[in-house]
Amino acid sequence: MQSAIKSVEYDRPLAAGAACGVGEAWAKVPDALVPDERDALKARIKALLVREKAVLVAHYYVDADLQALADETGGCVADSLEMARFGRDHDAHTLVVAGVRFMGETAKILSPGKRVLMPDLDATCSLDLGCPIDEFSQFCDAHPERTVVVYANTSAAVKARADWMVTSSIGLEIVADLHARGEKIIWAPDRHLGGYIQKKTGADMLMWQGSCLVHDEFKGIELDLLRHEYPDAKILVHPESPEGVVALADVVGSTTQLIDAAVKLDAQRFIVATDLGILHKMRLAAPGKTFIEAPTAGNSATCKSCAHCPWMAMNALSNLADVLERGHNEIFVEAAIAQRARMPIDRMLDFAARHKQRVQASGDLQRDQALFANVGAA
């Protein structure tokens, strides 16, 4: 594997008008609500969704109240791939995206005629922050012979510079296909996900050195100790996690794939190495099973995130209601950038649709998704 001689930081100084950094994000997380306030806000939001001909599209990592509200109102709670498809195909006039900014941008790119709102436009992503378009363009220009594959967790401008966009649920399959065709790849921005895919496919990948603030904090040593404490538990790991964590996994997969594994595996106890927001959906999908948060640090240490994204935490019932009431926090993407960015997104969606048809025809969806057999071995 080749790797870029480059170091990037997710909490770098931000340009004027850029989304907020880690500390400011935590400061902007809305206060918790008492039950009466929560119920009143949910009722208000339901009425506003109808009034505005809007649908709520939420990620698995946002607050459980938002996920429940999306389910109750005919919206969507999903990973970034399904969020993109759902928003594109839904007939709502307005898409309200509860997640981080790149998700809102992707929704706008795929649905240019729809209004796209977000509870807080400052909600960003460490991977997005760590891959600024000017530096990334220079990096790509230095290697013009390579196919540029970017993760969904990037800005619209970075996507516009790419040949392919991928999510964690389809990235391995797309890179394997490109490798089979003899293509050399630039991968950005997550080095852990890229390294996992490279080891699985053998592809020639030149890596951008970004990482997720949440997943980068999981500790292999501490996870191994927890595994011995709960020897009957299966370990579920998102591939944005460090190699030492992935090596201990029983299942490595996207958020949707990890939820599927929690439902379908016979185990009654799971250790989960991804953002703790996913536990809401896991508990609903697999009632009676026990889910334990994977450790982000030792008992005497501190962590940056404690397994929760500060920018995801900025999404709340209070600012969702405010956005619907006032019609602000609308996402806009420059037309030329949106047009270029749509190509790699559509390529991914088309590939995913064809891949799903092939797998369904073979009758072997579980094995093809690598959910259950030796997936932790890299």
Swiss-Prot record:
Which InterPro entries does the UniProt entry name for this protein? NadA, NadA_sf, Quinolinate_synth_A_type1
Q: Which keywords fit this entry according to its UniProt record?
A: 4Fe-4S, Cytoplasm, Iron, Iron-sulfur, Metal-binding, Pyridine nucleotide biosynthesis, Transferase
Q: Which cofactor does it need?
A: [4Fe-4S] cluster
GO MF annotations in UniProt: 4 iron, 4 sulfur cluster binding; metal ion binding; quinolinate synthetase A activity
Instruction: Specify which residues bind [4Fe-4S] cluster according to the UniProt entry for this protein.
Output: 125, 212, 309
- Please write the reaction equations for the catalytic activity of this protein: iminosuccinate + dihydroxyacetone phosphate = quinolinate + phosphate + 2 H2O + H(+)
Q: Name one Pfam family in it.
A: NadA
Q: Which residues bind iminosuccinate?
A: 59, 80, 151-153, 168, 238-240, 255
Which free-text remark accompanies the cofactor? Binds 1 [4Fe-4S] cluster per subunit.
Q: Which Gene3D superfamilies match?
A: NadA-like (3.40.50.10800)
Cellular localisation: Cytoplasm
Q: GO terms for CC?
A: cytosol
Look up the EC number in the record and give it.
Answer: 2.5.1.72
GO BP term, example = 'de novo' NAD biosynthetic process from L-aspartate
Pathway linked to the protein: Cofactor biosynthesis; NAD(+) biosynthesis; quinolinate from iminoaspartate: step 1/1
Its function, per the record, reads:
Catalyzes the condensation of iminoaspartate with dihydroxyacetone phosphate to form quinolinate.
Q: Which PANTHER family match?
A: QUINOLINATE SYNTHASE, CHLOROPLASTIC, QUINOLINATE SYNTHETASE A
Looking up HAMAP family in the UniProt record yields: NadA_type1
Report the family membership.
Answer: Belongs to the quinolinate synthase family. Type 1 subfamily.
UniProt protein name = Quinolinate synthase
Which gene underlies this protein?
nadA
